[in-house]
Amino acid sequence: MKPSIHSLAHQTMQEWVLEQGEKKFRADQIWEWLYRKRVQSFEEMTNLSKDLIAKLNDQFVVNPLKQRIVQESADGTVKYLFELPDGMLIETVLMCQHYGLSVCVTTQVGCNIGCTFCASGLIKKQRDLNNGEIVAQIMLVQKYFDERGQDERVSHIVVMGIGEPFDNYNNVLNFFRTINDDKGMAIGARHITVSTSGLAHKIRDFADEGVQVNLAVSLHAPNNELRSSIMKINRAFPIEKLFAAIEYYIETTNRGVTFEYIMLNEVNDGVEQALELTELLKNIKKLSYVNLIPYNPVSEHDQYSRSPKERVLAFYDTLKKKGVNCVVRQEHGTDIDAACGQLRSNTMKRDRQKAVSAVNP
């Protein structure tokens, strides 16, 4: 399979055109066609020679993803199911926010973190996405608006889709550099957020990178016993090790951290847990922010249910009274397969059922 042209950083593109016997400025032209004019084929790059277009076609593809399903919500949320060149499926979500268009990208096919409440982990990790496959998700969402003649542009990115981004560290970093490049989509680093389930050593590495991308940590519980019961990653990186890495990140970057906390009815949503959480955050309270997330039920995880509004409000009020910055996340796409991984999982089930029916009519 030929790689996506989006896999090449700008400098790598310059090196490639020089290897082809071309002038270095050709790299700028190619990038302008890809990221500013957003063409879908090399033939549309009309200021390139036929010989260079042939070389591009011989070595790369523009778009490695095939659109399988698009679900549009009444609130403007759009969920995409894309097929990779090897036939595997991934999800991408567009959310219309008051501050702009935000896209949630996937970084792996499946997930090995194994959170007991999450649809993403229903299918184990099969492979990492490469940089080009992650970039292509942004480009295809942008194409959705371009084709409708809507003068809107993707302005924010959250790396919170299927997979653990820091388990695909190098590809995710290269994605940041490509999408942030002034000659490309030029999406500001501070408009990008990456979420990790808590790979402590990678949080330290990320602190040392010096990038301005925002960090979010999927916490979901304030103590080791509870967190280990719902997130097996906590057995490898218990809260003490995780928070040592978070404090290192804050000290190194002087940047805040968002903590994601999914509200599971009578599991982690009591006032007692809220008080534990305030204690856990006491040393970093000024540079921490808690995002309380209403739970999207997953049929395979029917041991969990959504916290009632009164329990969410009591938890929220407890945090606020203790001086913790927090918010209840606005929901998007509740009338479609909203939970991360749900559309992919449901589609794979239907595909399997069709295959069985074809064999046993």
From Swiss-Prot:
Compartments where found: Cytoplasm
Listed cofactors: [4Fe-4S] cluster
Record text on cofactor binding: Binds 1 [4Fe-4S] cluster. The cluster is coordinated with 3 cysteines and an exchangeable S-adenosyl-L-methionine.
Biological role stated in the UniProt entry: Specifically methylates position 2 of adenine 2503 in 23S rRNA and position 2 of adenine 37 in tRNAs.
Leftover remarks: Reaction proceeds by a ping-pong mechanism involving intermediate methylation of a conserved cysteine residue.
InterPro entries reported in the protein's UniProt record: Aldolase_TIM (IPR013785), Methyltransferase_A (IPR040072), RlmN_N (IPR048641), RNA_MTrfase_RlmN (IPR027492), rRNA_lsu_MTrfase_RlmN/Cfr (IPR004383), rSAM (IPR007197)
Family: Belongs to the radical SAM superfamily. RlmN family.
GO terms for biological process, alphabetical: rRNA base methylation; tRNA methylation
Catalyzed chemical reaction(s): adenosine(2503) in 23S rRNA + 2 reduced [2Fe-2S]-[ferredoxin] + 2 S-adenosyl-L-methionine = 2-methyladenosine(2503) in 23S rRNA + 5'-deoxyadenosine + L-methionine + 2 oxidized [2Fe-2S]-[ferredoxin] + S-adenosyl-L-homocysteine; adenosine(37) in tRNA + 2 reduced [2Fe-2S]-[ferredoxin] + 2 S-adenosyl-L-methionine = 2-methyladenosine(37) in tRNA + 5'-deoxyadenosine + L-methionine + 2 oxidized [2Fe-2S]-[ferredoxin] + S-adenosyl-L-homocysteine
Protein name: Probable dual-specificity RNA methyltransferase RlmN
GO MF annotation, one: 4 iron, 4 sulfur cluster binding
SUPFAM superfamilies with a match to the protein in the record: Radical SAM enzymes
Radical SAM core domain mapped to chain residues: 97-329
Disulfide feature: 104-340
Keyword vocabulary terms for this entry: 4Fe-4S, Cytoplasm, Disulfide bond, Iron, Iron-sulfur, Metal-binding, Methyltransferase, rRNA processing, S-adenosyl-L-methionine, Transferase, tRNA processing
Catalytic residues (UniProt): 91 (proton acceptor), 340 (s-methylcysteine intermediate)
UniProt binding sites for [4Fe-4S] cluster: 111, 115, 118
Residues reported in the UniProt entry to bind S-adenosyl-L-methionine: 163-164, 195, 218-220, 296
Superkingdom of this protein's organism: Bacteria
